[in-house]
Amino acid sequence: MKARLITRFKDVTPEGGVIELVVWRVTEPISPSEHGFKYRAAYAIDGVRLVGFDNERSKGDHCHMRGSERRYTFVSVEQLIEDFIAAVDAERAKT
């Protein structure tokens, strides 16, 4: 499977958290996802993932929020970025 990098972002927050997002365009969907993107996005502090979005093979599109996993409906790369930023902002507001 050939992949082309669409975007990559990584930042360290003042409190030491790491925010990272990577999206690739793939030639074939990552089953069971039906779109042509492979992605991973995570917000972690001290190595503990608090927020994550990805489409791991066999699991499809899903997100992680403080250890719980739920389905995620992928609409577009732009919407993924908005949803990820909103989830990170909500998590950072808790601390």
Can you describe what each PLM-predicted range is?
Residues 68-95:
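Short, compact, well-ordered microdomains
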Residues 1-62:
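The feature represents the first ordered module of a protein
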